[in-house]
Amino acid sequence: MQWVRDQVETYERTGGREAGTLRDTGIPVIIVSMRGAKSGTVRKIALMRVEHDGDYALVASKGGAPDNPDWYYNLVAHPTEVTVQDGPEPFFVRVRLVDGAEYDEWWQRSVAVFTPYAQYKEKTSRRIPLFVATRSTTADAEGAAAKRAR
């Protein structure tokens, strides 16, 4: 979608000073960059900013659609080749799918930030995947890239 590409470009260019909210909602977003599962090309998206103790929730809601967003498969394929930008500079993260009580806690945090998630959950028969992104080191991402190149 062009508006997503425009938002990502503006956010990155201004270090988050502009385009830091979801359209006209005033709700903050983060920029998530990842490697494409099939293409290997870097993909970027803006997601709702759900942060707790330095970790971030990445909610694969796709507006309650019956299928997962494409970026879900990118994160599953390359969980250590991900960056988050929450302000002027991006940083490396590792992502992991959560379940059980941890899922419930992060889901509650996510709905508190963006209440439409609750409607999305009611709208779909799938369990909306939820990743937690935790800060990582450059070495983690470089090691993953080196393994892939072999």
Predicted regions located by residue number:
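Extreme N-terminal tail/first-helix region
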Residues: 1-25, 146, 150
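Short coil/turn segments at secondary-structure boundaries
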Residues: 22-26, 121-125
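Short beta-strand segments
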Residues: 26-61
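Short hydrophobic/aromatic beta-strand or adjacent loop that forms the aromatic wall/cage
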Residues: 29, 127-130
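Short, well-ordered beta-strand micro-motif
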Residues: 33, 132-134
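Generic C-terminal helix-cap and adjacent flexible tail
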Residues: 136-150
